[in-house]
Structure formats: structure tokens, C-alpha cells
Amino acid sequence: MLNSKNCGELWRIVGRNSYLCTRILYIDVRMRFLGNIEARADAKGRVFLPATFRKVLQASGSEALMLRKDLFQDCLVLYPECIWNEQMDVLRGRLNRFNAQQQRIFRQFVSEVEAVTLDGNGRFLIPKRYLARAGIQQDVKFIGMGDTIEIWAGGRAEASLMSSEEFGQALESIMATEPAPADNL
């Protein structure tokens, strides 16, 4: 238990343990995109990144973004560049460069991403092929997913959600088990 008597001792231990110190720093500065915000894409496919998400990006010092189609759902995913690089490093570390199938997996993973930048007004351009893949025409919904942001077409986001009862049961099942190791991103 943390109290004023042992606080100094705990920080002395943290100071000697670079891994623990790194993990504490990581926990304090990690990005948190939360909530859902509706927006509109213009005729060119430009859309404003919601101000709350821009503030999180600016606070992290990472304003470069990577955009790709979600692997499992009909939405797009915006990654801050630092998070994207971590994902690439994890995937590359698990794949064998000398295995043809694994090279194809990596090639497809990195070839389906595009760097996007915010203009002076806080907008970014969603390329036409991504608009088509996600079914985005005009109405857009941003959903903060912690370290990434999902971009959905109009009402498609709601269709992907569970009912309240189903969500409660799923969450109960997950929380009743031991947590997985923290090595995944």
C-alpha cells in the first residue's frame, strides 16, 4: 500500500529499474482517443478531424497520421504515426522474411496504408478508394478507440454495435477471466 512513509522507497526502486520506469512513462503519455463524433466529408473527400482528437495528437507530439481500411469491418482506421510504427515493428518481428507467405502478408499490410496530413484548418483528405471501401459518401462518424480512430460511413457504426444485453454479457465474460499478458498492442 502506498503511503507517505514508503513513497520515497518505491521511487528509489523505480529509479533502479529502467523497464519499470519506461512502462510508467509509457502509461502516463499514451494517447487516448475516446468518444464518437459526427462529421461530414466534402465533395473532394476532405473531413475535419474532431478538435478533441486533434488536441490528443498535439499533446502527444505526433501529428502525422496513417490511414487504412479496417481488417475486419467496413470502416477506416486512423493511426498516429508512432502507433502505426509500433504495429509494423510487432508484425515484422513475428514474420519470417524468408517465408514467401509471410512476406505476402507483410506486403499487403503495408501496401494498404496511406499517410495523411492535416491542413491548416484541421482537415485531411480521404482518398477516393478509401471512401469507396468504407461506403463513405458524406456523413461520417469518428469513434475513438484508445490509440486509434475509426471512421465510419453514416449509420454503419451503429449496425456494428451489440445490443446492451449482449454487450453486458460479453464484458462480464471477458472481465471474469485472468487478463492476457500486456505484450500486445
Residue ranges, per PLM feature:
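Flexible "stalk/tail and boundary" regions
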Residues: M1-N36, A43-K44, F53-N121, R129-L185
